[in-house]
Structures are given as structure tokens and as C-alpha cells.
Amino acid sequence: MAVDTAQTPESNSIDTSADNVLEVRNLKKHFYVGGGFLARNSAMTIQAVDDVTFSVKRGETFGLVGESGCGKTTLGQTIIRLYNPTAGNIIFNGADISSLKANDLRNHRRKMQMIFQDPSASLDPRMTVGSIIAEPLNIYGIGSREERQERVRELLRVVGLNSYFTNRYPHEFSGGQRQRIGIARSLALNPDLVICDEPVSALDVSIQAQVLNLLRQLQQDFDLTYLFIAHNLAVVAHISDRVGVMYLGKLVEIGEAKTITEQPKHPYTQALISAIPVADPGRQRDRIILEGDVPSPANPPSGCRFHPRCPVARADCSEQEPLLREVTPGHWVACHYAE
């Protein structure tokens, strides 16, 4: 059951402005894994998302970045309620949807949609493109059959595809075209918030920029708000207004995209930035190599979860967990020694 923990220290990092489309307060998503009949005592808890707090303003793009397994996709799926939260609050358009039942959640969910990572897996191969895009309209009973068909043709044109593609099947399209179909489907109900889960990572580099530019144009045309999830910080910084950096289920840094890329404060963010190639051949960037593997979310380290891999960790980092604190206006860092 979701609980209200809005008064905990890290909740100070959230902007509770009326302009927020989304507020996430101390959100947790834990998975309980049993040991089976022969290992009943080996049950464990996977702390996929652990005490995450942030807000997203109307019309902005908030980027979530981190290594694979950090919990960013689980966070997005919990926000849209594909998973039920273990604890915490999800405030969408001013309403707490954390513990709503299916019938009550229905009207809120139509205003938040998701673009999935792999268009080959997220589009039903047995359905035509027209049926795929029209499915949300059918579920909510919007418009007549003719109006739905016209809406589908309009959405295809909006994402840069020909309107006569409605009777074709997903396998007849390239990866970039299939992702455009997925984007069209996400727009069918005129959402306020679109959660973009690694929307370009499965595409060729030559196609990624086209899809990113399309998302930007659609945001301007339809007043969309994006939660943009990716493992590539360069991509996230390119499209986002603000960025949150996740590590092992927790947010370790939040700030304006330019601030995060030019003045990163958390050692983990600094390591991610150092891996981004520099376009200027006359300029070099010192690469920060992190040693060791990411610890298991079933047994996270004590204190700061990053301390086993941190190049500047000290003794107290393994004992006391750092909370997000504001080091400069709008720039929050969970590190004892960030300045």
C-alpha cells in the first residue's frame, strides 16, 4: 500500500508547483523473490526503486539516466502503474494515483502514455498498423468508426508516415518506422505525459537523431510533457530540460541538463560524463574508469550505494547514506562531499 512520506528530508528536492504534471514522492518498488520449495530460507528483496523523489513541470522534458539495471525502466513502469508501488506517492495532474484500483485509474491513465524501447516487441505482429494505433480509441470508445479511421490517418501523417499504411503489418516496416508507429499510438488519446522508455536505443545511430527531432517537434505541437529514460547521457542531455541520474535504485543527482553535463557534482555523474566523446579534436577529457561491478539490488551496500566503486570514497561513506541536498539553486546531489 502506498504511504504518504512527503515530509521526509529528501522530499525537499521536489517542486510542488501547481504547474507540475507529475510529482513522485519517496517512491519504492521492491520485488520479493522466493527461494522455492528446496530453498525456502533464501527469499530476497530486489530493491529496484528505493525512495525516489522528483517532479516534472508541464511542457518540459525530464531525463532519467543510468546504467542498465539501475531501476529507471522499473521507475517509469511504476509511475504509469504497470507495477504497483511498494510505498510512496505518485501525483499526476494533482491526483494521487498511487493506490487507485483499475476502474478509478482508467481515466487518469488515458492521459499518460508510454513509448517502449523495442518497437518490434511492443507492436502486435498480428495486427495492422491501423488497428494498433486505433486500439486506445477503441478501448475508450472515442468517436465513430469513420472518425477513428481519420484519426489514425492523421496520426500517421503527424509522425511522418503515409496515411495509406493503415492496412500494413509491423514486419513490413524498418525499425525507425515501427518506432514512429509506436509514437503515433501513444498520441492517440491526446496525453499530457508521455514516458519514453529508451525510445531510440534499439535504432541505428543514423535514425536516432530523426526520432529525437520528431519527439521535440511533437512536444511543441501538442504541448506534451516527457519523462525520457535512457542509458546514454549524451542523448538524454540533448533532449532534456532537466536530468536525474540514477544509481542502484536511487537518484544521486538532479539538475538542469546543461548544469549536469558541464558541472557534474556526483562522482558517478562525473564518470558518465567522462565517457561521452568530445566533438572537438583539440580538446580532451580525462576518462574516469569505475572499478568493479554494480552491486546487486538484492543486497545493496550500506551507506552510500556508490561507495564500493567511488574513486573519492571515505570511511563515513560506507556508514551513512547521503540525502539529496541543494548545492546550488535547482541542483541537488546525494554525496557527502559534493561542493
Predicted regions located by residue number:
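Short catalytic/signature loops enriched in Gly
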Residues: D4, S13-N20, V33-R40, T45, ...
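Conserved ABC ATPase signature
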Residues: Y169-F173, Q177
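Conserved ABC transporter NBD signature motif
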Residues: G88-D96
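Conserved ABC ATPase "signature" region
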Residues: A95-D96, E147-Y164, Q270-S274
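P-loop NTP-binding/switch modules centered on Walker-like glycine-rich loops
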Residues: I195, P199-L203, I207-R285
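A short, proline-enriched helix->beta-strand linker immediately N-terminal to the Walker B motif
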Residues: A188-D192
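ABC ATPase NBD coupling module
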Residues: L38-A43, N84, I97-Q113, I139, ...
